[in-house]
Amino acid sequence: MAGLWLGLVWQKLLLWGAASAVSLAGASLVLSLLQRVASYARKWQQMRPIPTVARAYPLVGHALLMKRDGREFFQQIIEYTEEYRHMPLLKLWVGPVPMVALYNAENVEVILTSSRQIDKSSMYKFLEPWLGLGLLTSTGNKWRSRRKMLTPTFHFTILEDFLDIMNEQANILVKKLEKHVNQEAFNCFFYITLCALDIICETAMGKNIGAQSNDDSEYVRAVYRMSQMIFQRIKMPWLWLDLWYLMFKEGWEHEKGLKILHTFTNNVIAERANEMNADEDCRGVGRGSAPSKNKRRAFLDLLLSVTDDEGNRLSHEDIREEVDTFMFEGHDTTAAAINWSLYLLGCNPEVQQKVDHELDDVFGKSDRPATVEDLKKLRYLECVIKETLRLFPSVPLFARSVSEDCEVAGYRVLKGTEAVIIPYALHRDPRYFPNPEEFQPERFFPENAQGRHPYAYVPFSAGPRNCIGQKFAVMEEKTILSCILRHFWIESNQKREELGLEGQLILRPSNGIWIKLKRRDADEP
């Protein structure tokens, strides 16, 4: 009887404890929610003085105002920046998150030069499943340490080693384009992108994937599909929660793509690490380094040997993060710049003629591979690339998460705000670029650029978190463009309004880049 009574008492105690725990959890949840609402209301009130586009509603902000279609959304943002060009900055609420749009050089400088405002936007978290916490997505001390370790790997003398790869892949591209000579206009965007993918894969990993020959490979498909899925997820707040995302078809496909990408990279890292260990063993027994003496050096080789201030090497997971980051950042952006350059040259034959004259001065009629010295002499072509990136920056907007309260143009911007820099609008400021819609490479002649605000032009970002690979990118762009333009004359009849600009992770023409090719020797004007 006593045992039965004790059992009943124990059950009641358990029930009471469970009820208390549920009540406590519920109270904690309500308290947390109230704190968030109070913080949101405080931010709302404190940021009220900042100019905005229209009335924002509590909790949803301007979300109901935003276009859902990628093309329409980008066009909407650009229209806002044009309409409010006279304003120093512009506030938007995306749900409960405040954003300030910056498209004025003086105010962009405030954010980009700060050694404290270096945290990337929270939206970059959707890249983390693929890229981990590499150079693009990491913050704070990890980013500082990683940046310091990796900066020497992008020294120009090291980049020179990659020129042979760039020349080889550019020649493959030219052969692929031959079939379009004197034919109807065709979309060149995918051709250029596959060439850039081959280059970044071989320079980053030392692996020739032959994307230009086999664009249907599993890895190539996974790279493209992953970029698309990440952008789509960013636009759909209801898919932001990981557990919820995995309940949908998109989440399953995302996981499948990650497995393909990570397996490929892990295998390449393991294979190269084993080769390097074997080389060391050979040297240790006095047999030289024959196993890989003819193997080209890749970024991966440098990552396997780089150390921090304390002599620690990167783990294989760290290396995978950086290799995947190079893959993600190093092909789409460069391919976009080359495509936009071809489009603008095709629309501006007088500029193309100047480029051709410069190419003749440097190469004559030879089709030999470009050397580092050749590329240095292509100064006008470099101005063409710079002007292209002014009009069509590969990354049309990027963001920083404000890590502490700051003042911009006399307005208080609170911690937790997303500061969105819009190069597409910034580069069209008529104070620094008169007749901003005109294609004028001469803007970047030294005498014409003198005195221009240093933050009026930021195609590779600027400040502490500028693009570490910008020299690599320009080198690749000059190599590929010089190879194409030595063989072909470009024509383009597309009007800008026909391009269908879409500001995804990069600035894409949703309708493609359509050009005609003529053999330069025979048909050059």
Swiss-Prot record:
Topology class, membrane: Single-pass membrane protein
What keywords tag this UniProt record?
Endoplasmic reticulum, Heme, Iron, Lipid metabolism, Membrane, Metal-binding, Monooxygenase, NADP, Oxidoreductase, Transmembrane, Transmembrane helix
Q: What is its EC number?
A: 1.14.14.79, 1.14.14.80
Annotated membrane-spanning segments are: 13-33
- List the cofactors: heme
Q: Where in the cell is it found?
A: Endoplasmic reticulum membrane
An example of a Pfam family matching this protein is: p450
An example Gene Ontology CC term for this record: endoplasmic reticulum membrane
Q: How is its activity regulated?
A: Inhibited by N-hydroxy-N'-(4-n-butyl-2-methylphenyl formamidine)(HET0016) with an IC(50) of 38 nM.
Q: Which GO terms describe its biological process?
A: fatty acid omega-oxidation
Q: Which reaction does it catalyse?
A: dodecanoate + reduced [NADPH--hemoprotein reductase] + O2 = 12-hydroxydodecanoate + oxidized [NADPH--hemoprotein reductase] + H2O + H(+); tetradecanoate + reduced [NADPH--hemoprotein reductase] + O2 = 14-hydroxytetradecanoate + oxidized [NADPH--hemoprotein reductase] + H2O + H(+); hexadecanoate + reduced [NADPH--hemoprotein reductase] + O2 = 16-hydroxyhexadecanoate + oxidized [NADPH--hemoprotein reductase] + H2O + H(+); (5Z,8Z,11Z,14Z,17Z)-eicosapentaenoate + reduced [NADPH--hemoprotein reductase] + O2 = 20-hydroxy-(5Z,8Z,11Z,14Z,17Z)-eicosapentaenoate + oxidized [NADPH--hemoprotein reductase] + H2O + H(+)
Q: Which family does it belong to?
A: Belongs to the cytochrome P450 family.
Protein name as catalogued: Cytochrome P450 4V2
- Origin organism is Pongo abelii
